[in-house]
Amino acid sequence: NEPELWAKVKKIMLPKDYIAYRLTGVHCTDVSDASGMLLFDVKNRCWSKEMCEICGVREEQLATCYESYEKVGCVLPEVADELGLPHNVVVAAGAGDNAAAAVGTGTVGDNMCNISLGTSGTIFISSNHFGVDQHNALHSFAHADGHYHLMGCMLSAASCNKWWMDEIIGTKDYAAEQAQISKLGENHVYFLPYLMGERSPHNDPNARGTFIGMTMDTSRADMTQAVLEGVAFALRDSLEVAKSLGIHLER
């Protein structure tokens, strides 16, 4: 949409890759982050010539793609001196945030799963084999050691709780608010956590957040509970999609 800026683009890199470039002088990225750029052939772990042609991206604009554990290069001597580092410090390609967290939590191999909560929330399911969700609800990415993963990502997760506490009820005392919740399994107030539209598994930018089921007896604690449960069940939506694909989670 901004051709005058696009014409000036020499290399396409993600933020961590730019840092690696400044350290080593090497234009690089890794397979996990490249998988989310819509220019990557995830199954074959290389740039997609077809997608690059469609998008008008030239091969020389793309960084060299590495496995996450591979050496990109060493810190340049002048950079090492400036930072007070030894010479020949090795820089690895690294990984995207969720992929790195998955390795740290042992989410590698077949049918392992972790959940990550931040502004957004993810369901991350590792696999030894490449797989595609034909309904386009879950994303297919390259993962560690030649493996792959499926990921469901909701746009508003812990940010829903922050919005509710900061903007609506005006307190940061999370423990006090949650201590008032006593109707586990009995609350009839529901919250749809689509404050910024939704990605997985609905792919609907026009989805909006909603409280449902309120009565004159509804308490603040009921609504706080509904926000927490709404996020949990929105994550479960992606989990149910994974199960419908025949995935049987081991953990």
Regions found by a protein language model. Name each.
Residues 1-29, 38-49, 53-54, 77-251:
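Active-site core segments that coordinate phosphate-bearing ligands/cofactors
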Residues 35-39, 60-70, 150:
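A glycine-/small-polar-enriched, mobile loop at the entrance of the PLP active site in fold-type I
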Residues 71-75:
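Gly/charged, well-structured mid-domain segments that form the phosphate/adenylate-handling core
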